[in-house]
């Protein structure tokens, strides 16, 4: 018999270095006073992202579980999500009134998607440093995620990327789905992401 609330599960995906862990850090710090939050991270051989969040004091250590997938990170969030589902359940049992569990995928490519059994909402993170062509390359992360985060806009002048081109391409690839340009170091765009989570996740304000 289930003796805990079913939290909102938010999958956070994106290529290595795009800013997934940085996003989770700022989200947790901004939302933890209003909501009960926990995090599951995925790494192939280590628990490095979990350690980063713990060191940053994003949440108490008992609210973070690092899953070592030991293989293709896509499989652990899609075809066989059992390890992640078990981690979510463990966190929900530890903290009976959880509102949100973020599930961060291991570094993946544009074709990775979350199993609907694992994530109620999905956020996909790309970054400007990968080049302005990234949005038009498509893939499920770009086209099907519930929210697309285009991070590190401050780097655009240094990598020769046009934010105007990126926005036009993103609008073509996601004509009815939301996206946001961010600089997470300066918290630019953070409130838009929080509002999306609250509204789409039907959380209390």
UniProtKB/Swiss-Prot annotation:
Compartments, record wording: Cytoplasm
The UniProt record lists the keyword Magnesium: no
Keywords from the UniProt entry: Chaperone, Cytoplasm, GTP-binding, Nickel insertion, Nucleotide-binding, Virulence
Subunit (UniProt): Homodimer. UreD, UreF and UreG form a complex that acts as a GTP-hydrolysis-dependent molecular chaperone, activating the urease apoprotein by helping to assemble the nickel containing metallocenter of UreC. The UreE protein probably delivers the nickel.
Annotated binding of GTP, by residue: 14-21
HAMAP family found in the cross-reference section: UreG
Any one biological process term the GO annotation gives: urea catabolic process
GO cellular component: a single term: cytoplasm
Family label: Belongs to the SIMIBI class G3E GTPase family. UreG subfamily.
Matches recorded under SUPFAM superfamilies: P-loop containing nucleoside triphosphate hydrolases
CDD domains: UreG (cd05540)
GO molecular function, one term: GTPase activity
InterPro entries tied to this protein: CobW/HypB/UreG_nucleotide-bd (IPR003495), P-loop_NTPase (IPR027417), UreG (IPR004400)
Superkingdom, natural source: Bacteria
Protein name listed in UniProt: Urease accessory protein UreG
Purpose: Facilitates the functional incorporation of the urease nickel metallocenter. This process requires GTP hydrolysis, probably effectuated by UreG.
């Amino acid at each position: 018999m289930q003796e805990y609330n079913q939290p909102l599960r938010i999958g956070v995906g994106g290529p290595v270095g795009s800013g997934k862990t940085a996003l989770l850090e700022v989200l947790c710090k901004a939302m933890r006073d209003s909501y009960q939050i926990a995090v599951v991270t995925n790494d192939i051989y280590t628990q490095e992202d979990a350690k980063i969040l713990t060191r940053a004091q994003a949440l108490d250590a008992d609210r973070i579980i690092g899953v070592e997938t030991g293989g293709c990170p896509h499989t652990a969030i899609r075809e066989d999500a059992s390890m992640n589902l078990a981690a979510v359940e463990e966190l929900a049992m530890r903290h009976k009134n959880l509102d949100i569990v973020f599930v961060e995928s291991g570094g993946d490519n544009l074709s990775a998607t979350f199993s609907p059994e694992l994530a109620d909402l999905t956020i996909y993170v790309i970054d400007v440093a990968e080049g302005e062509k990234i949005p038009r390359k498509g893939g499920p992360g770009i086209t099907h995620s519930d929210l697309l985060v285009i991070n590190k806009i401050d780097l655009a002048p240094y990598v020769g990327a046009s934010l105007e081109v990126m926005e036009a391409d993103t609008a073509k690839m996601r004509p009815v789905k939301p996206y946001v340009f961010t600089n997470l170091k300066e918290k630019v765009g953070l409130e838009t992401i929080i509002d999306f989570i609250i509204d789409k996740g039907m959380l209390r304000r």
